[in-house]
């Protein structure tokens, strides 16, 4: 545990050192005045001329929301078409055929919504062109969408008596040109220097030193495993002495996969694969890349509203929640797994099942907490192999609404929604009209807040309930009992909250799960973005109220505690009954 606490402390210090200047830089990028941060001005203006965009024309919240939805719908259609036509397109050295319609739909929605749920195996499904032109491009655009939306909300707080919240196309372009692309280039070059591959070669067939005998599951005509009368998978012995090594442009996609809190990797093993994450140093940089923009945006928030203490308060609430849950996950994994107690496995160091020896329990536990605190979903260990209490942590982090740092942009606007709720609750307790950053919280704002908070629990709980009842949903569950329920609950929690990680024991690449999870991903993204933009518009139109003796300070320890309490209260009341049927019951049964 001491090793974990040391690595956690080093991680947080380095993150803070990097995030603060990046936050100040983004304040200049998205500010209303000309800034030295606009160092790529000629490139930016060229994009506007080509696209026919007037960067001086600002938008009301409805126009802004329409632009967000239109660009993402077009993106989803483009990714879908690319997958369906990839067998006729270049940069497909393995000759992969068209992706099935249901999987194409799921993948298109997944990458457009910044979820990156992957029901397929990337190295055996997607061509290089599909990975680069479809998935990697959406890694940039979905992250840029999240940043644009949170910047619009911040402008709503910063402005007063205004009818506009900015220009989506300007925010979208600046997010990509000034933030995402430069960071991705730096990180990509670093990854290449550490051994992450970057090429367009065909896959390599190599001969192994010794032959390998393994149990190969038998598949039916639809590609699903055949089960015996007891429900166990039917296998047959197979032997091989060759191995296929996948190639591809990995480093370039790996960088934006992390920086944009996307999470979907070119390989099925994701960041556990040595071609994506070869050593402890790349692992540490990947963890930094996940949190760097969400943390920096807290400083951008403080800078744009003219009070840096506001950003510190939000960052403090996020950090407290993160540290507590990270320590709990590490504690659970540093203990032996009761399921393996009777198998004669040496668990003196803790639960090593599903973890890479080059990372160990400490780095794997920290990575698992970071990737689910942010809406990233990349993994360097298999979450399905975590202990019951260990698996509880990433699931609960997602169910909190991905607000503990959260996704790029989405984490901060999600936490600001909770800040509005916290101020409203405080106002009720002291009998004053609630206000936040000088803006009065009224009926419309609370309606939008309620919608934004309640959408994902509705999708998660209803989706899980349907999946464990209907035949198509139950067919994908291979682990009976509480763990099987946990796998389904995790899948819908991940999809609706746009995380993308999985308890991979669930067979989710089926028409039922592809459609159900795809719908959850889309609604979980845009059913929150629209209310957030609506609040941005109403806040911008309001007058700024002067600070009085009765105004609740929203920059001190009391507000931090109130904000944390609001997040936990909603999460606990909503999900504890479902969690009691899954990981909690699984732990008690052992």
Curated annotation (Swiss-Prot):
InterPro entries hit by this protein: KdpA
Transmembrane annotation, as ranges: 3-23, 63-83, 134-154, 177-197, 284-304, 312-332, 359-379, 388-408, 411-431, 451-471, 515-535, 558-578
Protein's membrane topology: Multi-pass membrane protein
Swiss-Prot/TrEMBL keywords: Cell inner membrane, Cell membrane, Ion transport, Membrane, Potassium, Potassium transport, Transmembrane, Transmembrane helix, Transport
Listed GO CC annotations: plasma membrane
Keyword Magnesium set for record: no
Main localization, broad class: membrane
GO molecular function (one): P-type potassium transmembrane transporter activity
Localization of this protein: Cell inner membrane
Subunit structure: The system is composed of three essential subunits: KdpA, KdpB and KdpC.
Family: Belongs to the KdpA family.
Functional note: Part of the high-affinity ATP-driven potassium transport (or Kdp) system, which catalyzes the hydrolysis of ATP coupled with the electrogenic transport of potassium into the cytoplasm. This subunit binds the periplasmic potassium ions and delivers the ions to the membrane domain of KdpB through an intramembrane tunnel.
Name of the protein in its database record: Potassium-transporting ATPase potassium-binding subunit
Species per Swiss-Prot/TrEMBL record: Ralstonia pickettii (strain 12J)
